[in-house]
């Protein structure tokens, strides 16, 4: 692979352009402490309550891993990869064809108020990137918006 001047990668084995995709949700303010928000996101079963209405499957596979599917989309398995108490949770793809991470950034505003933002990052070929950018942006916005009423 070689990095081009514009920051894209070229995979010379496949002659495909690899895009580094970074998407961020809006920040949402919760009437919960940073510790409460962290604890909620640390328990993977809680992600079921954050999912969009068009979810067709949700299953906790292990204490730190879950599977979900949205109608018309393939199943995705996410595994907790990193946790920094009260400030950051990183979920990563666990198997499958796509390698990506979903990071929850938690900031304390006050003792009983916090701010959460989700960030999606991954490397995809240009065609895949164009296809998934819109749905993933909407997906992470839905997850963070649903946090307000989830707990």
Predicted regions and their residues:
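Hydrophobic ligand-binding cavity/cleft-lining segments
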Residues: 3-59, 65
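Short acidic, gly/pro-rich beta-turn/loop elements at beta-sheet edges
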Residues: 36, 76-78, 90, 101, ...
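Glycine-rich portal/gate segments that line the openings of hydrophobic small-molecule binding cavities
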Residues: 49, 58-97, 150
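Extended interaction regions within the primary functional domain
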Residues: 9-13, 17, 54-58, 132, ...
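Short, intrinsically disordered, mixed-charge
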Residues: 39-49, 85, 137, 141, ...
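Intrinsic-disorder/low-complexity, polar/charged segments enriched in Ser/Thr/Lys/Arg/Asp/Glu/Gln
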Residues: 22-27, 65, 75, 88, ...
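A short, structured loop/turn motif at beta-sheet edges
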Residues: 34, 82-86, 107-115
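Beta-strand/loop substructures that line and gate deep hydrophobic ligand-binding cavities in soluble
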Residues: 94-145
């Amino acid at each position: 692979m070689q990095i081009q001047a514009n920051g894209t990668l070229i995979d010379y084995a496949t002659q495909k352009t690899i895009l580094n995709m970074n998407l961020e949700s809006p920040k949402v303010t919760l009437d919960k402490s940073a510790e409460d928000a962290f604890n909620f996101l640390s328990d993977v079963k809680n992600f079921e309550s954050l999912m969009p209405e068009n979810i067709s499957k949700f299953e906790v596979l292990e204490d730190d891993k879950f599977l979900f599917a949205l109608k018309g989309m393939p199943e995705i398995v996410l595994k907790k990869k990193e946790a920094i108490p009260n400030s950051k949770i990183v979920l990563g793809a666990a198997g499958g064809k796509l390698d990506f991470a979903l990071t929850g950034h938690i900031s304390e505003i006050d003792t009983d108020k916090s701010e959460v933002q989700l960030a999606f990052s991954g490397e995809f070929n240009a065609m895949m990137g164009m296809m998934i950018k819109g749905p993933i942006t909407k997906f992470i916005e839905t997850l963070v918006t649903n946090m307000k009423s989830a707990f």
